[in-house]
Amino acid sequence: MIALKRIIKYVKTTTNFGVWYSKDTNDVLSGYSDANWAGNADDRKSTSGDCFYVGNNLVSWMSKKQNSISLSTTEAEYIAAGSCCTQLLCMQKLLHDYGICQKHLTIYCDNTNAINISKNPVQHSRTKHIEI
């Protein structure tokens, strides 16, 4: 009963809250990806986080524990960028269904080595075990 009262109070006090989207004519789809390395002390798995924008408006975000244990920050960031790419491709398809065509998708990643691997995905001894 106490939980129900809290929910009703929350809904009542937040009825004026909302999300504001600008009338930005920029319809460029972009994604920001980040990951922490071995952030979970119990199983040493990393967590990926992604934010997706159309123009200047945030339209989606996600946070997910990665399925595998990364051996480095580069691997964790590369896996996060791959997940971000997958989501962006789905969003590109969805926007295309609404008549908004995207020719280029941009992914922002803060790890130089992960960016270099994505530009040249040749299997090196340090990267051949990575599965996305």
Map each language-model feature to its residues.
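Divalent metal-binding acidic/histidine catalytic loops
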Residues: 1-132
